[in-house]
Amino acid sequence: MAEIKSKVTLIGAMLARPGLEFIYEGELPACEQCKVRKACNNLKVGRKYRVLSIRATVHGCSVHLNGACAVEIVESPMVGLIKADLAIANSRILPDLSCTQSECKSYPLCHPDGVVSGERYMVSEVLGNAPDHCDKGRSLKLVELLPI
């Protein structure tokens, strides 16, 4: 399996702690005039990231009260449900996010935070069967997904 590359970005100093996971939502209008905005906005919208380490560098920021802190991050794996026939370790898949049964107990795992529609992922690990029944009657497996 390929090694996951880390990168450096900036997040709010009050949020910066190892292990923090977050989903990057995009650039804010308040960032337009900032000198370091490219360092803050060097991530992909909708992707889930995990902080590995914190650097001493802190920059003034109009968005974050105590400034923005430099952190080393990696893309974080997501746990979700996929069709059982696609649940093969190290396979590359395009998750099916078309289900609209929002009242189904499995819905949050069928639409995990950080999975972007139309993007491919690698099944890094098959974790087992779905914890709840699918309202559509589909056979699902719980897996760990990594962005490709």
UniProtKB/Swiss-Prot annotation:
Pfam families: UPF0179. It comes from the Archaea. Disulfide bonds: none annotated. InterPro entries: UPF0179 (IPR005369). Belongs to the UPF0179 family. This is UPF0179 protein Mpal_0949. It comes from Methanosphaerula palustris (strain ATCC BAA-1556 / DSM 19958 / E1-9c). The lineage of its organism: Archaea, Methanobacteriati, Methanobacteriota, Stenosarchaea group, Methanomicrobia.
